[in-house]
């Protein structure tokens, strides 16, 4: 995750750490002073773009929680990167699970479906994200998809 000591992702990282998971923080140098103590490993990057690339490189499954423009940017960047990598690596496809709490991402999901149905998608599965309504469904989905990764 982004590796800083604030926000929803800090809470998720803390819970994962407390449950015995290894927590890897990928932190841009500009935010290194905010590195979360819960991280078992810290990877410093030059900037946000390098951070996204590194997170995509090392991730097995991607979870999109309710968030702002940065979350949407990371979601679409991850989707795009996976689609590009699939051209050269058949194993590049990895799950993106979107927690669509209270319809937070209804508009984005609809836009991706519309793009998928348009001639601009050129046969690519733009709408491949798996939408779930809540954390319970997220956990069920992660259990299911993690057996395939």
List each language-model region with its residue ranges.
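Hydrophobic alpha-helical segments of small multi-pass membrane proteins
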Residues: 77, 96-97
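A cross-family phosphate/adenosyl-ligand binding-site feature
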Residues: 1-58, 87-92, 98-148
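Structural loop-to-beta junction motif characteristic of Rossmann-like glycosyltransferase folds
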Residues: 63, 94-95
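A donor-sugar binding/catalytic signature common to diverse glycosyltransferases
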Residues: 56-76, 87
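Interfacial segments of multi-pass membrane proteins
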Residues: 83-84
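Short glycine/serine/threonine-rich phosphate/pyrophosphate-binding segments
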Residues: 7-11, 70-79
